[in-house]
Amino acid sequence: ALRGLGKKAKLLFSWDEFDRLRKIPANVAAVRDDMEQYIGMPYVDVPNPFGPEGTYADYFETEFTSSVSAFGIEMDYRRQAQMYRGGKYAKYVLEAVAKRKQIYDILARHRTQAPTEEERDSFYPVSIYCPRCGRDTTKIVSISDDNAVAEYQCDCGHHGTFDFRTDFNCKLNWKVDWPMRWLYEGVDFEPGGKDHATVHGSYDTSKDVSREIFGYEPPLFQGYEFIGIRGTTGKMSGSSGLNLTPEALLRIYQPEVILWLYAKTEPMKAFDFCFDEGILRQYGEFDRMLARYLNGTADDMAKGIMEACLIKGRKVEPVPMNLLVQMGCVVNFDIPRLEAVLQKNGTPYSYDQFKDRLDRARYWLEACAPDQV
């Protein structure tokens, strides 16, 4: 939209692969029962649970990037393990360590529990990954007068020193890391889940850190509601294993319909990805709005929505999804027979018109549809 207005803009997608593995998602535990040993290690150092090649981070990053091209969205990617370990953030880490008591005071303003001087003295806004066990189960016990060299101990029994000028295997705490990256990248706008948008939440706290520690005016922020999943259980969540990748969604949704769901929904209103019959309703609503757009009867809102979701180089043929499900089931998805049945039904769609939806209709019917459908 910004580029359409003649603005220079880029969409930055950050892989938080340098975060610690907190718990084992259900879908990961289902294929490997030994993953708990890696809790506390960064995702980029955790082995791939689904195969012999690459890491945990590699697997999910590759899955995402290989399917996101279907949406016609251009993104710049940042891999945080490379950024931290490459020393790109070193001067900001040093600054945060030097200003650790000021950071503590900012964090304390946004907490309900009363701060203590003992806690303030022992606070450090950074976690060191242990060179012996690879985990972040370390505690800084002292710091040099110039705030450059820390002495630390790890729960695994290892003791060591860490020079923030030359050692980079560490990561700032979230509410310091986030504003640091705003400064580094020159971020102007960033959305975030509604949990980050609460009063005294991540954004409220991070914007104060941004201004008072890094001297950077924080970006405009837009909170958004969580996305639901109908036909299964729970909200989208990476740690629960219920997350849906673009690849999984594209098995039943055309990319334009996914973009349309986002474009038509206000940020703080929820919507569901439907694995039940609700998906047929969504396709129907999409087709009706598309028809209004194409025949020139759409209002400005609908026109803007459709222009945001239609993908250059693709043409959407609005063959009714419920019709493909019903008739496809009758002829066992045999294409010549399906064309003949549609002709007799007075809906003479050809294979070229319905091929983009047919496989999705079949997959949904066989893998997702409720028993009564």
Residue ranges of predicted features:
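Catalytic adenosine-cofactor/nucleotide-binding cores of aminoacyl-tRNA synthetases and other
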Residues: 198, 203, 225-372
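Active-site cores that bind ATP or allylic diphosphates and position pyrophosphate for catalysis
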Residues: 73-246
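A broad, structural surface signal
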Residues: 3, 62-69, 94-101, 105, ...
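N-terminal Rossmann-like or analogous alpha/beta NTP/dinucleotide-binding catalytic cores
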Residues: 1-104, 206-208
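Hydrophobic transmembrane alpha-helix bundles
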Residues: 44-60, 107-127, 131-133, 255-266, ...
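Glycine-rich loops and low-complexity Gly/Arg-rich segments
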Residues: 34-39, 101-105, 156, 164, ...
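A glycine- and charged-residue-rich anion-binding loop/surface
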Residues: 1-8, 67, 127, 134, ...
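Short, solvent-exposed loop/turn and secondary-structure capping segments
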Residues: 21-24, 108, 141-143, 261, ...
